[in-house]
Each structure stands twice: as C-alpha cells, then as structure tokens.
C-alpha cells in the first residue's frame, strides 16, 4: 500500500491528520535535519498502522515535505 504524506516539521504537537483526498498530514516536533523528521514520521506511521518500522519504506521525497511511503 502506498501512502502520500505531507510532513509539517517543527510543529507544536506530533499528530496525523487524514485529508479528504486520502493523503496524510503528519505534524512532527522534530526539525528536518539529517533525516530526523523523516525517521520520526516513519515511527508515527508505524504506530498509526500498527506495523513494525522496518515494514515502512520511503519511496519518494527524501528531502521534500511531500513524501510517498510504502507499507
């Protein structure tokens, strides 16, 4: 399953919002340096979908706010 994600780094709270078009907006308190925000997003997605972190793979958007993950 592929998931389109819009990442909001340096947010006040960690949360996941489902948009009407099916994409996810993931708010993370982590700064977008050295892939730390992406790692935090993977952790949050793993908790949200109740899967191990190792089963989530970044397909596109390593340095972008718009990312595509595969579970």
Q: What positions do the PLM features span?
A:
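Active-site-proximal or metal-binding-adjacent scaffold patches in catalytic folds
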Residues: 12-15
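C-terminal structural segments of small proteins and small subunits
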Residues: 34-35, 42-71
């Amino acid at each position: 399953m592929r998931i389109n994600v819009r990442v909001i780094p340096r947010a006040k709270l960690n949360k996941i919002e489902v948009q009407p078009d099916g994409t996810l907006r993931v708010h993370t308190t982590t700064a977008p340096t050295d892939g730390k925000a992406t790692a935090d997003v993977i952790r949050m997605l793993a908790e949200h979908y109740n899967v191990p972190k190792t089963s989530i793979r970044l397909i596109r958007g390593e340095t972008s706010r718009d990312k595509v993950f595969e579970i």
